């Protein structure tokens, strides 16, 4: 029996596992999917070194005021850079009409991570004992029986 069961291997679950591991606590993580990351999903760019070039299919940006993610990125050695925001915005509406006269930059000030958001997932996962990480294990029931959770 473990002290803590973490349900979900997204960024929050991995951060919890990381904090518990660094504090010397006993924990176990269950993730229903066969991969870690939750909504963070990055696709490897073909013909590039593994992890060097990815594009994000889930969250892609973070902001300067998100100090927790920036601190985590620094601790994991993940390079942070500014989102390119120069140039003009091209917008395609639902009917397929293009507008090129828009002169605003919705992502100005946004930050990106080298290797995509997946770099945070990989960095956290690398520091965890893999025997405590259970992939492809959906949890369908939690019960308190005989003084313990099962």
Map each language-model feature to its residues:
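FAD-dinucleotide binding site
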Residues: 1-150
């Amino acid at each position: 029996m473990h002290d803590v069961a973490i349900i979900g291997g997204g960024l929050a679950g991995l951060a919890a596992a990381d904090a518990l591991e660094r504090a010397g606590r006993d924990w176990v993580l269950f993730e229903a999917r066969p991969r870690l990351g939750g909504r963070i999903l990055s696709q490897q760019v073909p013909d590039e070194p593994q992890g060097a070039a990815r594009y994000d299919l889930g969250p892609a940006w973070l902001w300067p005021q998100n100090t927790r993610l920036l601190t985590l990125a620094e601790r994991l050695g993940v390079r942070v850079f500014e989102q390119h925001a120069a140039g003009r915005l091209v917008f395609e509406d639902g009917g397929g009409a293009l507008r090129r006269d828009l002169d605003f930059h919705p992502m100005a000030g946004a930050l990106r991570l080298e290797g995509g958001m997946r770099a945070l997932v990989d960095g956290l996962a690398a520091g965890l004992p893999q025997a405590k990480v259970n992939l492809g294990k959906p949890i369908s029931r939690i019960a308190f029986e005989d003084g313990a959770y099962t």
